[in-house]
């Protein structure tokens, strides 16, 4: 495998397509799993604690 211009010719396939649940272009066409909401893997919406901004708390 070489890097650079020859490798760019291989980048013509759609890896991710639109997700039926969240609508984002995050549904992996081969794996059949959405990387954004977890559709295809889980019935619950994927969410993380670090994803939401928490209110500032006093430090002293």
Swiss-Prot record:
Positions of C4-type zinc fingers: 19-37
Biological process annotations from GO: translation
Record's cofactor remark: Binds 1 zinc ion per subunit.
Domain of life: Archaea
Cofactor requirements of the protein: Zn(2+)
One example GO MF annotation: structural constituent of ribosome
Homology family: Belongs to the eukaryotic ribosomal protein eL37 family.
Keywords noted in UniProt: Metal-binding, Ribonucleoprotein, Ribosomal protein, RNA-binding, rRNA-binding, Zinc, Zinc-finger
Residues that coordinate or bind Zn(2+): 19, 22, 34, 37
Described purpose of this protein according to its UniProt entry: Binds to the 23S rRNA.
One family name in Pfam for this protein: Ribosomal_L37e
HAMAP family: Ribosomal_eL37
Identification of the protein by name: Large ribosomal subunit protein eL37
One term under GO cellular component: cytosolic large ribosomal subunit
Keyword Hydrolase in annotation: no
């Amino acid at each position: 495998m070489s890097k650079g211009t020859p490798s760019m010719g291989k980048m013509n396939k759609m890896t991710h397509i639109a997700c039926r649940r969240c609508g984002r272009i995050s549904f992996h066409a081969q794996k059949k799993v959405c990387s954004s909401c977890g559709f295809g893997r889980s019935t619950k919406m994927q969410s993380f604690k670090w994803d939401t901004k928490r209110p500032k708390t006093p430090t002293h």
